[in-house]
Amino acid sequence: MSTQIAPARISDPAAFGRVAVLLGGTSSEREVSLNSGSNVLDALRARGVDAQPVDGIPALAQALVAQRFDRVFNVLHGHNGGGEDGIVQGLMEAFGVPYTGSNVLGSALSMDKIRTKQVWLSLGLSTPRYARLAAGASAQQIHAAAEQIGLPVIVKPANEGSSVGVSRVFDQAQLDEAVTLAARYDGALLMEQLIEGDELTVAVLGDVALPSIRIVPKGQWYDYNAKYIAEDTQYLCPGLDGDAEAQIGQLALDAFRAAGCSGWGRVDVMRDGSTGQLYLLEVNTAPGMTSHSLVPKAARQLGIDFEALVWRVLEQTL
């Protein structure tokens, strides 16, 4: 599968009009979103775009009522005051304002890791074995789910990102602590089979899968610290070779489209170290745009710098 990005369609920054960079918010990913938004804002302004920051959904609603903006670049991460659960997409559609990223359905579905898995499985796409745990699940239910899936497992909130509230569990004694951590966040919990092997991610831009990235953290796994703070995490791009790289790119596109996503995003995948089997984990519909973020790294592999990447994403609103 060739990875070719068409040339930019727009050359005049005035074509975008007044652009709101939606950032911050009140989700658990606020700090990451502020960082992403600041980078996007700087890149747009460097290209001559009339861009202004807007912190959170209430501020955006006020701006839309006042007709202050012509379009929105959404880097509001997460849910519950974030911009990846379909709520802010519905707001922007109600005002008829174009925005970056997936629509209401794609955003809402992808924010719910459990429902996304159900869609993938219905289409024959591989994802780790899992169980849904309701908030307040009993110890008996928790341990029964782990026994059914088979240890080791990962326990996480079903609707959070950035590895917030995530634990790896290798024995029954660790389960209660993992569930307690994940239960600090709203909604159901997801317990899923832990796939031992390579952690990979594939960015999607338009209808093209960018080169995959294989993530090699210094520690045992790619947690919040490895994602946003540590300087010793290795990123290998492309992450795979030959047919395997083509396979993961096509899988990412299939998974992205199956979830109703469009515009741009990122699909996270595990590759079993013993069998080479690929397993879909989740879709991110407003990926990070920090100095550690993965979409910019993949774009650079194709000669697309950060400013050009931000421009390409915004182009999709025209």
Swiss-Prot record:
Binding site for Mg(2+) 2: E282, N284
PROSITE patterns associated with the record: ATP_GRASP, DALA_DALA_LIGASE_1, DALA_DALA_LIGASE_2
EC number: 6.3.2.4
BP-aspect Gene Ontology terms: cell wall organization; peptidoglycan biosynthetic process; regulation of cell shape
Molecular-function annotations in GO: ATP binding; D-alanine-D-alanine ligase activity; metal ion binding
Pathway assigned to this chain's UniProt record: Cell wall biogenesis; peptidoglycan biosynthesis
Residues given in the record as ATP binding sites: 146-201
SUPFAM superfamilies found in the cross-reference section: Glutathione synthetase ATP-binding domain-like, PreATP-grasp domain
Subcellular localization(s) per the UniProt record: Cytoplasm
Residue ranges constituting the ATP-grasp domain according to the UniProt record: 117-315
Residues annotated for Mg(2+) 1 binding in this entry: D268, E282
Keywords per UniProt: ATP-binding, Cell shape, Cell wall biogenesis/degradation, Cytoplasm, Ligase, Magnesium, Manganese, Metal-binding, Nucleotide-binding, Peptidoglycan synthesis
Enzyme class at the top of the EC tree: ligase
Protein name: D-alanine--D-alanine ligase B
Organism: Xanthomonas campestris pv. campestris (strain ATCC 33913 / DSM 3586 / NCPPB 528 / LMG 568 / P 25)
High-level lineage: Bacteria, Pseudomonadati, Pseudomonadota, Gammaproteobacteria, Lysobacterales
